[in-house]
């Protein structure tokens, strides 16, 4: 089975940004030729930070959106980040999708923090507040936007579609794909019952925010995905 092993971003200062992901978000960081890699141990994807980029305002009409970091205890993670002076939004349960919070890295790239369990369902023994981000964090999603989900799915026929999540009042739906032989516990891919299962997967999923018919522009910083 192939693996989604990296997200390639062209940034202003690869080493400095990698240090943020290491010091603040608990990833390992190391130099690799002219780039820096930052990632968690395990089968999830790394960030591959390449030189030559410049800091620009990111907007909602761009192809690239965010990364999502899944973890067992969102409240502990946010408390830790605030103690380090990081501006992170208040955790909230977004519809029947997940308990989440948002922040930006020093170059303005969006990061979502997503708890394994919905609000009020976290086990008492989840995570460890002494570990970075409360322990157990992994890169759960790389999120792109699309105006044509049928074309995206056709281009990625070797990936399994694991979940489809409607967010009709905001005018989009979400599709999650992965290189895996696993099947969700509930055969209906729209079932809410699959979502907490999805946030626990050890591999990184490719998430599409589908805005039907949207005309999106390329993101200068997004240099594609690494597959191994």
Could you say what each language-model-derived stretch is?
Residues 1-48, 52, 144-203:
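Core segments of cupin and vicinal oxygen chelate
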Residues 3-7, 45, 61-67, 138-142, ...:
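Short amphipathic alpha-helical segments
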Residues 6, 78-144, 155-157, 162-194, ...:
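Vicinal oxygen chelate
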Residues 39-42, 59, 102:
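Short glycine-biased active-site loop of nucleotidyltransferases that positions the nucleotide triphosphate
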Residues 49-54, 126-127, 204-212:
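Short amphipathic beta-strand starts and helix->beta connectors
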Residues 54-55, 100:
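Histidine-centered metal-chelating micro-motifs
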Residues 59-60, 131:
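Residue-level marker of regulatory loop/turn positions in helix-turn-helix DNA-binding domains and
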Residues 71-75:
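Short proline/glycine-enriched turn/loop motifs at strand-loop junctions of beta-rich domains
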